[in-house]
Amino acid sequence: MLLLSISGIQLQAQNTIKLTGLVSDIETGKPIDVATVFIRSLNLSTESDEEGLYTLAAPAGQSLVLEVSRLGYKGASYPISPLEAGSTLKIDFNLVLETSGLEVIIRESIVRNNGMIREKLDNLKLIPSTTGNFESILPHIALGTSSGTGGELSSQYNVRGGNYDENLVFVNDFEVYRPQLLRSGQQEGLTFPNVDLIRDLSFSSGGFEARYGDKLSSVLDIHYRRPDSLRGSVSMSLLGASAHIEGSKQIGTNPYKRFTYLVGARYKTNRYLLNSLQLEGEYVPDFADIQTYLTYDINKNWQLGAIGNYNTSVFRFVPLSRSTATGLIDFSLRLSANFQGQEVDNFKTGMGGVSLTYIPERKKNPLFIKFMGSAYQSLERETFDIISDYRLALIETGLGSENQGKELALIGDGVQHTYARNLLYLQVKNLEMKGGYEYQAGTNNEKTHFFQWGIKAQLEDILDRINDWERLDSALYSLPHTEKDIVLKNVIKTRNDLNSQRFSGYFQDEYTVQKPGLGELRISGGVRMAYWSLNREFYFNPRAQVLYKPAKWDKDITLRLAGGLYYQPPFYREMRAPDGIVNTDLQSQKSAHVVAGMTWDFTRGKKQQVPYRLISEVYYKKLWDQVIYDIDNVRIRYSGKNEASGYITGLDMRLNGEFVPGAESWFNISFLRAREAITGLQHQRRDKGQAEGMDVKDVPRPTNQFMTFSTFFQDYLPNNENLKVNLSLTVGTGQPFGIPGNNRVFRNTYRYPAYHRVDLGFSYLIWDRSWASRRNRHLLRFAENSWISVEIFNLMKVQNVASNTWFKSIYNVQYSIPNYLTSRRINLKFRMSFH
């Protein structure tokens, strides 16, 4: 069995799945030898041995039919849905004699590779999304994943108590990056992954292998399609548009020389959504990107690949006015503000990569080697100069009062002036070589070692220019107030230039053994090493995991245990303190993970057996050398010091299946506890009504979201599958936050309100090519299929909070006013596919 994660490789049978099982007599239970097990369409076959066991390698990602025949017995066949490379499918055939009146019985079970959650995108494209980004889907399908405080305006996600910077993202084995200066979800444009180009994805919420890199939380591994024919699609809505084209062409007469192309372009504007915010003004967001993935099969053994992306995000905003009320029945505040000035942000990113893959044709012990090179570049400009004349007042909220809504007392009246001229230029270049070799042992290859290794060199150039300040004037006094000088608040003026080199490598072995009657055992162990020239830190991380699928259990269950050390070396944002000073001696953040879980595949149904999958995992992460941070909307502000330790523990569960035949749905629920403590500092907590604080051992991390629940449910009209309904529900307890500038001793003592949101979509199939014979004059007959959708965002019109705006009175008392996310909006969408 060859367990590969090479993007797009489909040469010979190296990108394979393993089909294995037992052929036996249904009446006696004895094994049947010399039974022919074959796939007719591919001319692949094998025979069962003396113990009735067989093993057959087949191409991944294809629909297959496995057949078995034996002289004197009735033949049997079993359809196989497309599976990912590295999957093992166990199919047992209980055959009957030709003279018997019994029916053949076939049992299937599958062992997924590496403890990763894998999904295809066909059913997920209908999920209502306000961002247009693929990552918005993750909270509905991935374990322990939430959307964070950015809510529906952001595609950032938190995994098991970590922040967004702790997540790895790969597309076709290339690591991808995102802009660093984003402050809010309003500025966020299009992320790298293009849903129109994705073939499948793998996601690990923790305990991942050594080959995946150096982050604390998760891995998202995306593979783009390798086309086999000419296809395309067009999509349009009130929030933007997208289009893609793909194709494959044989070069010359040699069938092994083939060129494939995949090109996609997207445009996004969330002006329609932003106009529902309480901060009124002229929003002009324009986001666009274009990307391509090309491959060329040089011959049987060599393949050349190239990937490219150019992304531009421009956000223009002229604020006009704002009126926000907040508080309780007996104490409510209203903020009224008028604005002058504007904000213009410009983010331009580009990425290009090439790969050369060698897979020699071998009958046994397959091998692959892959050479990769890539470059990423971003130029980010953030400019704003906005003056706000604000008025903060206590208002009457008594029911039935004649003065309801009127001011009772003036709390603050002043001017807030924010200014920024920030520039960040970032360039990352890397070279990488990785490989894999599978050693097969045993008469039926029931024992295998899959060795994988890789080395990588990375160069980073960073230029940062910050000119950022705020002036707060309350009752004609500039705060902070002095008798002689006008002192600005939060002044940052720095010039930082960094050049560094990173080197990393890994080695791991995956040992798989199958024994009749015992099941399949897979043990993976590896080490990861890295060095960074800037802080001169070298580390060595061992990681391991065990997957076991018992054969004697009545239930189809796979058990998993994983653990190891996971270090995250700092990138630029972690090193930059709130005052703009960069700490080049900052060491990596460190953690030790333990993850235990199970995957249960089962079927239910009276008339037809419908497959379901239940995944459950518990985990514990010990943290040290942590860099504390505060989250404001989507902006993460680090302290720039290794000054904290902590832990994260929790439970994740996911259930998915066809609750409605032909329409798959997902249900996710997670519980976690994330705590931290600053070294050398005694934290305190002040309970409501208490004047004095009491000592506590630790405090909540900013991502300490106790519970999250999300679901994506699909249904359709009875007897009419052309009209589909999909519901997206997200519920999460509030995340903690603290007072700006005073969030250390009494750290993260407050919480945002709970987040809850319902998005509803209706999709109607208005054309399908199968109708051509009876509708040969249809307006859309040139298309393969066409859908029209109506999406209702925030169906319940809930006011969810993204962040707070803070104001001070002349008495130096701080008041927080919530910044709410979007209200209810209706979106129209049209999608057309060509083939």
What are these regions (language model features)?
Residues 74, 81-89, 110-208, 219, ...:
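Periplasmic N-terminal accessory/gating domains of Gram-negative outer-membrane beta-barrel systems
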Residues 297-312, 342-535:
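Face-selective signature of the C-terminal outer-membrane beta-barrel domain
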Residues 512-519, 620-622, 642-739, 831:
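Gram-negative outer-membrane beta-barrel transporters
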Residues 722, 730-740, 764-835:
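C-terminal beta-signal and adjacent terminal beta-strands/loops
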